[in-house]
């Protein structure tokens, strides 16, 4: 159901944000167009050239160094705990980002989905200049 479309990186060293735009999907009789927001990421840069080929590991909440992540679904922001972000070169001279984590759906009442592990991979661009 949740499939990435593209990711956008912005911010400054030590405080980077990553927005993962999702492919729209059908949920409870309506189309949903949403994104995963990851804020306060402790990365050395928001420039893709500086991140290419690197993997970053993160602690999970409630650790103070954890990424502040969420997905808006069913009228609520559901936490996303992210443990790994990897920046990989792609065949077309671009960059892809791989994100590993857990959707914490139980936090806002989507108990039927529980806490669901995920791995997402998509192209990434940056607003850094």
Descriptions of predicted regions:
Residues 1-76:
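An ectodomain-focused feature that recognizes extracytoplasmic/extracellular
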Residues 57-125:
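Acidic, glycine-rich flexible loop segments
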């Amino acid at each position: 159901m949740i499939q990435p479309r593209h990711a956008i990186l912005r911010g400054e060293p030590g405080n980077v944000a990553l927005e993962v735009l999702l492919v729209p999907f059908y949920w409870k009789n309506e189309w949903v167009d949403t994104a995963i927001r990851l804020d306060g990421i402790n990365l050395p840069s928001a420039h893709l050239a500086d991140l290419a080929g690197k993997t970053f590991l993160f602690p999970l909440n409630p650790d103070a160094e954890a990424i502040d992540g969420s997905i808006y679904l069913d009228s609520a922001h559901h936490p996303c705990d992210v443990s790994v972000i990897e920046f990989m070169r792609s065949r077309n001279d671009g960059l892809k980002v791989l994100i590993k984590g857990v959707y914490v759906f139980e936090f806002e009442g989507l108990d039927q989905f529980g806490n669901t592990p995920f791995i997402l991979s998509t192209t990434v661009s940056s607003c850094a200049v």
